[in-house]
Amino acid sequence: MVKSHIGSWILVLFVAMWSDVGLCKKRPKPGGGWNTGGSRYPGQGSPGGNRYPPQGGGGWGQPHGGGWGQPHGGGWGQPHGGGWGQPHGGGGWGQGGSHSQWNKPSKPKTNMKHVAGAAAAGAVVGGLGGYMLGSAMSRPLIHFGSDYEDRYYRENMYRYPNQVYYRPVDQYSNQNNFVHDCVNITVKQHTVTTTTKGENFTETDIKIMERVVEQMCITQYQRESQAYYQRGASVILFSSPPVILLISFLIFLIVG
């Protein structure tokens, strides 16, 4: 019984090795074309045999030893040994010789204007000595008590800033000081920057701009104050003894 099992395993091993060798022999060689080495017309058998006699060395339609339609030894439709659609060799389909790759996705282009603008904004803030630049805001709707000024603001609001410069709120004792400093530095920087571009502001522009920037600075103060108190509350919460004891107990349970 043992000998019969050993013989069966030897037979299975022999069959597996023989099958692997057979598959290796059947693998196509690189560089050959479709139906290379055959002498029949691909896909259409002729009842009377080949209609035309072979011409030296290759199969039917192989004048120089290649596959069907291989005048120089390439694959099917390969006149010079490349891939299908490669008249002069090369890579994949549509990559023949000096031709560019067909339908190749182009690389995304970097918007240099955005990069330059970001770099300039960072340089201006760095040169102001501790001032930060707030996020962009929608320009507020303000009534100035004069039809002329209201109309002037609606027609020229795009010329006024939509961001403000400010220092951290913990450096000021109250909102008025924060807003006053914020308005002065923002109007000054916007006026200087715009003047260097060849555009001047009138007295009406300055008056309207100060009102607009004041409202924006108030909004910025409210945002910064809320964020500051939330950070302070988080620090107080996690520094209290009960919370520290609870966290230590949880760490002990996890580690232990």
Swiss-Prot record:
* Pfam families for the chain: Prion (PF00377), Prion_bPrPp (PF11587), Prion_octapep (PF03991)
Q: Where is this region: Interaction with GRB2, ERI3 and SYN1?
A: 25-233
Positions of the propeptide removed during maturation: 234-256
Give the UniProt keywords, A-Z: Amyloid, Cell membrane, Copper, Disulfide bond, Glycoprotein, Golgi apparatus, GPI-anchor, Lipoprotein, Membrane, Metal-binding, Prion, Repeat, Signal, Zinc
List every stretch annotated Disordered: 28-110
Gene Ontology molecular function: copper ion binding
Sites binding Cu(2+) 1 sit at 64-66
Residue ranges, annotated region (5 X 8 AA tandem repeats of P-H-G-G-G-W-G-Q): 54-95
Q: Where is the lipid attached (GPI-anchor amidated alanine)?
A: 233
> How does the protein's chain sit in the membrane according to the entry?
Lipid-anchor; GPI-anchor
Name where the sequence repeats lie: 54-62, 63-70, 71-78, 79-86, 87-95
User: What are the boundaries of the signal sequence?
Assistant: 1-24
Disulfide topology: 182-217
Function of this protein?
Its primary physiological function is unclear. Has cytoprotective activity against internal or environmental stresses. May play a role in neuronal development and synaptic plasticity. May be required for neuronal myelin sheath maintenance. May play a role in iron uptake and iron homeostasis. Soluble oligomers are toxic to cultured neuroblastoma cells and induce apoptosis (in vitro). Association with GPC1 (via its heparan sulfate chains) targets PRNP to lipid rafts. Also provides Cu(2+) or Zn(2+) for the ascorbate-mediated GPC1 deaminase degradation of its heparan sulfate side chains.
Q: Which family does it belong to?
A: Belongs to the prion family.
| Domain topic, free-text comment | The normal, monomeric form has a mainly alpha-helical structure. The disease-associated, protease-resistant form forms amyloid fibrils containing a cross-beta spine, formed by a steric zipper of superposed beta-strands. Disease mutations may favor intermolecular contacts via short beta strands, and may thereby trigger oligomerization. Contains an N-terminal region composed of octamer repeats. At low copper concentrations, the sidechains of His residues from three or four repeats contribute to the binding of a single copper ion. Alternatively, a copper ion can be bound by interaction with the sidechain and backbone amide nitrogen of a single His residue. The observed copper binding stoichiometry suggests that two repeat regions cooperate to stabilize the binding of a single copper ion. At higher copper concentrations, each octamer can bind one copper ion by interactions with the His sidechain and Gly backbone atoms.
| Protein's name according to its UniProt entry | Major prion protein
> Which species?
Budorcas taxicolor (Golden takin)
Q: Gene that codes for this?
A: PRNP
